[in-house]
Amino acid sequence: MANETNAVEAAAAVAGHAAEAAEKGGMPQLDFSTFPNQIFWLLLALGAIYWLLKNIAIPRIAAILADRAGTISGDLAAAEQYKLKAKDAEAAYAKALADARAQAQKIIAETRAVIQKDLDAATAKADADIAARVAQSEVKIAEIRAGALEAVQIVATDTATAIVTALGGKADMGALNAAVGQRVKG
């Protein structure tokens, strides 16, 4: 019950203040009798806000901005260093690649020279071997012409034997002599 009594008294007090304000009329902010007091508190509040901004907020913001600017400039400097290192690495890579290509070309040229030398030697040997065989063949041809029919038959038999052997067969001498004799005679 005591609470209800207090609530009723509070409501009556508020109603009394409202009635008093209604009698004065107008808005309290526009009451010229309170302007000096309002101006004082306005200036005091603005001064406090100015002091807080000047001494606390703006220095903190400036420190954060300076820290960011330092970080950004440091990052840009590091990026520039990395860029220079990358250019140096690229130049070194290009030089190494060019050196490797030159070395490869040199090795290729040396290998070609060695192969050509070996090929020339093999060709010369083959030419000499062919020339020797040609000379031997010419001697045999001269002997065959000089030795007449019997020599032709011997050479033909030897040639047929060599051909059969070269082809991987076994030469039957009797059959070969008969075949060669028949061909030579006619």
Swiss-Prot record:
GO terms for cellular component: plasma membrane; plasma membrane-derived chromatophore membrane; proton-transporting ATP synthase complex. The gene is atpF2. F(1)F(0) ATP synthase produces ATP from ADP in the presence of a proton or sodium gradient. F-type ATPases consist of two structural domains, F(1) containing the extramembraneous catalytic core and F(0) containing the membrane proton channel, linked together by a central stalk and a peripheral stalk. During catalysis, ATP synthesis in the catalytic domain of F(1) is coupled via a rotary mechanism of the central stalk subunits to proton translocation. Component of the F(0) channel, it forms part of the peripheral stalk, linking F(1) to F(0). The b'-subunit is a diverged and duplicated form of b found in plants and photosynthetic bacteria. It comes from Rhodobacter capsulatus (Rhodopseudomonas capsulata). It comes from the Bacteria. The keyword Magnesium does not apply. Its main location: membrane. GO terms for molecular function: proton-transporting ATP synthase activity, rotational mechanism; proton-transporting ATPase activity, rotational mechanism. The chain crosses the membrane at residues 39-59. Keywords: ATP synthesis, CF(0), Hydrogen ion transport, Ion transport, Membrane, Transmembrane, Transmembrane helix, Transport. It holds the Pfam family ATP-synt_B. This is ATP synthase subunit b'. Belongs to the ATPase B chain family. F-type ATPases have 2 components, F(1) - the catalytic core - and F(0) - the membrane proton channel. F(1) has five subunits: alpha(3), beta(3), gamma(1), delta(1), epsilon(1). F(0) has four main subunits: a(1), b(1), b'(1) and c(10-14). The alpha and beta chains form an alternating ring which encloses part of the gamma chain. F(1) is attached to F(0) by a central stalk formed by the gamma and epsilon chains, while a peripheral stalk is formed by the delta, b and b' chains. It is found in: Cellular chromatophore membrane. Gene3D superfamilies: 6.10.250.1580. InterPro entries: ATP_synth_b/b'su_bac/chlpt, ATP_synthase_B_chain. It is a single-pass membrane protein.
